[in-house]
Amino acid sequence: MAFKKSSAKAACPETPVDLFQDLTRRKHPSLYDRQGQVLRDYHSNALNQSDVALQLPTGSGKTLVGLLIAEWRRRKYSESVLYLCPTRQLVNQVVKQANEEYGVHAEAFLGKKSEYSPQAKAAYQDAGKVCVTTYSSLFNVKPFFNRSGVIVFDDAHVAENYISSHWSMSIQKSGAGASLFSAVSDVLKKVLGSADYERLSGSGQSSEDMRWVDKVPSSDVASISEELKSVIDVNVGESGSVKFKWGLLRDHVLACQIYLSVKEILIRPIIPPTWTHHPFNDAKQRIYMSATLGQGGDLERMTGRSSIKRLSVPVGLGKRENGRRYFIFPEKSLDKDQVIDLRNGLMDMAGRSLVLTANDISANQVISEVRGMEGFSCFGKDALEGGKEDFVSSDRAVAVLANRYDGIDFPGEECRLLFVDNLSKATNLQERFFMEKMGAGLLYNERIASRMFQAVGRCTRGLNDYAAVVV
């Protein structure tokens, strides 16, 4: 049998906009004008920038823009392309949209890297497809994705906790970390006042104790650093994420801050040192996409980058609303029992509803109460991770998510009722310290506003969408 001559590589369209016309399997007849504006701006002004941020409002086709840029660079430069999402559910959603609606070949990477199929690994290593995975798959000690040409960060407004957690060692007072917490507390006793040490090591449950947050002065960290390293080395254990985090931080304790509360000790640098994480830093380009990008340097602080090129918001979109929301504040005039009765009545009228809570304790309480209502099904984070089809197909259902601002979207008739239950402003001890102890909440105003904007927008995903929001 004769050897076949390999065919020449197909020519790549000149721009991402031109690529859209070549996607013969797409179901969308054309790009929106706003999408075209962003793509042309990127091609003209940001093609060779190492860090690029683009902002598109909810419902304006941000995912398609990101996938077109990713697919175009994959074809044009034969680059391995990584598309990052905050959650597993969003990974599945993006891959489904890419393959079924946009005509872009995409591959989902979920679970342990040892579970990736040979075909999937080849798709990344040979730049055969757009590879979609979670933030956590890139930000770990030994990621599989170590040679990306381009990394696209979807929902970049939530990137901070996923990125900073890679260099954050959280020691909990209860559970498996109890012995380590006690040992570290004994070391910190030398540099803490008696009242602070009592709060840290005691079992105080008063509201004042629960609000307490503090930081060990940097000069004091220097004085106990060697003893602290020795104690943690002995007590950290041989398994679990704490050991891996300590491996990254151990030789850089003097560059870290130590934050304290009655339930947790957090050791981390103020800004995540992403320049030391080669799978992130060595990419030719990093693209950050969000519906809410601030101008105060918050994105740079979250990602550890000194400079990020921001593309202009498309003309005509700067002040456009994202659907209609009818806000209800029942606690202004009703007591606790009446609020619960109102909530149950609205759930009964709406059929499907979404509840966002501040923590797992509040979420479990809501789930318990809803299960007492006749004919209702409850869906938590795990139930929605693989997809939202079961929830959407139910006539009477409630989705309950704890401290979740992103990743779960319910456009149109999928859900018209949203409950926002006391969402917390701070998501970690560092944020709490700056807001509550230092009075520097101004630093986080954009971040807090972004979280609240994302929270109330879970059920209004387009200009013609609408929902009732109960706060």
PLM features: what roles do these ranges have?
Residues 2-55:
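Conserved pre-motif I regulatory segment
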Residues 47, 51-53, 57, 148-149, ...:
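Conserved coupling segment at the C-terminus of the helicase ATP-binding
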Residues 60-102, 106-113, 136-137, 292-299, ...:
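Conserved Walker A/P-loop ATP-binding site and its immediately adjacent core
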Residues 89-143, 147, 380-391:
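Inter-Walker segment of RecA-like/P-loop motor cores
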Residues 390-471:
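Conserved RecA-like P-loop NTPase helicase motor core
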